Curated annotation (Swiss-Prot):
GO molecular-function terms, A-Z: neuropeptide receptor activity; neuropeptide Y receptor activity; peptide receptor activity
Keyword Cell membrane: yes
Name by which UniProt lists this protein: RYamide receptor
Alphabetized PANTHER family for the sequence: G-PROTEIN COUPLED RECEPTOR, RYAMIDE RECEPTOR
Subcellular location, record wording: Cell membrane
Organism of origin: Drosophila melanogaster
Pfam families in UniProt: 7tm_1
Keyword presence, Glycoprotein: yes
Lineage: Eukaryota, Metazoa, Ecdysozoa, Arthropoda, Hexapoda
Family the entry assigns: Belongs to the G-protein coupled receptor 1 family.
UniProt keyword list: Cell membrane, G-protein coupled receptor, Glycoprotein, Membrane, Receptor, Transducer, Transmembrane, Transmembrane helix
Record GO cellular component, one term: plasma membrane
Glycan-bearing residues: N49, N79, N85, N183
Amino acid sequence: MEHHNSHLLPGGSEKMYYIAHQQPMLRNEDDNYQEGYFIRPDPASLIYNTTALPADDEGSNYGYGSTTTLSGLQFETYNITVMMNFSCDDYDLLSEDMWSSAYFKIIVYMLYIPIFIFALIGNGTVCYIVYSTPRMRTVTNYFIASLAIGDILMSFFCVPSSFISLFILNYWPFGLALCHFVNYSQAVSVLVSAYTLVAISIDRYIAIMWPLKPRITKRYATFIIAGVWFIALATALPIPIVSGLDIPMSPWHTKCEKYICREMWPSRTQEYYYTLSLFALQFVVPLGVLIFTYARITIRVWAKRPPGEAETNRDQRMARSKRKMVKMMLTVVIVFTCCWLPFNILQLLLNDEEFAHWDPLPYVWFAFHWLAMSHCCYNPIIYCYMNARFRSGFVQLMHRMPGLRRWCCLRSVGDRMNATSGTGPALPLNRMNTSTTYISARRKPRATSLRANPLSCGETSPLR
C-alpha cells in the first residue's frame, strides 16, 4: 500500500509507515524504504487512534479521567512495518480493525442512544412529578429531584459528546467551550450524586434513629441541596481549567488538524494527587458514610420488638413504609457504586505503566465507560418499580399523552371484553352481602365517571 499524503519522518524518508495494530507484521521484501521507528500507542489508546503523548513528569498528561478521552495511557516505540493510506475526507486508517468497523459503530449507537433517550425522559419525568404533585414535595423527594437534575446534566452533555467523539468521529468536533463544560459537568454530576446520597442517608438516619427530634424542613433541605451543588462545583473546578483541545501525534490528526478534548496538567504529580483526592471525595468518604448510616438504619428498622411490647397496626404500617424507603435508597446506592466505581478504579490503575500495556484494556475501558454512562437512566426505573407514588405519577403522566392514552384504552377495553366473553382470565367474583342490601339501595350510586379511575381512558385527576 502506498502512502499518497506522506509526511517526512525524522530520518528523511518520503513515505509514512503506520502501524496496523492487531495485524501480522506485514512487509513486502520488494519495497525499498528506510527502516525507522514510529511511536505506537498501547492497546487501550488504539480506540482513539492516537500515537504518542508526553508522559514525563513535566509534560502534559491526560488527567482525572473524563469520559471524553482515554486518560493516563502509556505508549511504547515499535518498528514501522505497515504503510497505510489516508485522506482527510475518508479516514480509513484502521478499516481492518474492530474499533473502526461499521459494525462496531452500529453497536455503539445501539448502546448509547437508548441511554440518552431514557435518561432524559425518565429523569425529566421524576422532576415533573415532584414539582407538580403537592404530596410528593417531601424532603427525600427534593433530594431525589436533585439526583435527577444531575443525571440530566450527565445524559444531555456527557453521553452524546463522549461516544460521538471517542467511538464515531475519533476527534472532538464541539469546540473549546464545550470541551471545558463537558469535562466539568461529568465530574460535577458524579459528585452531586455522591453527596446527595449522603444527604439522604443522614436525613433517614436522623428520622429513624431519633424519631422525636425535629425533622429537616423543606426550606432547610433546599439549602442543603444548594450546598451540595456548590461543593461539587468547587471540587471539580480544576478540571475545566486544565481541559483543552490538543492534536495527538497520529498521522491523520496531525495532517487534518483534528483536535481531541483532554486534560493537560502541568505535571504528572499534580494530576496523580488530584485524581486520588477526587476518588476519595467521590467514593471513599461517601461510601463510608453510607455504609455506616444504612447499616444502623437496617438494624433498627428490621429489628424485632422486645417481648411484651405492644405493636399497633399504625406501627406496622410505619415500619413497612420505612423498610420500603430504605430498600429503594439502598438500591440507588448499590447501583451508583456498581456503575461508577469500576471506571474510577480503572483510571487509577492506568497510572501504572505495566497495567497500561495490558492487551484486553481497550475492551475493559469500553465496557466500564458504557457502564458509567448508563447509570443516569437507572434511577427513574428504580423509583417506578419500588415506590408506589412515583409509579402512580408515571402512569398518570402516560395517560395524559394522546398516543399512550389511546393504546392503554384499547388494551383495557380488550381485557374487559376477553374477561366477559370467557376468552381471557376470569375476573374474581364478589359475594353480595344481603344484610346490607336495603341500606345500599338507599345510597347514591357510586360515580362511574372516568375521572375517578386513574387507569381509565379519560382524563385523570392529578396525583395529590
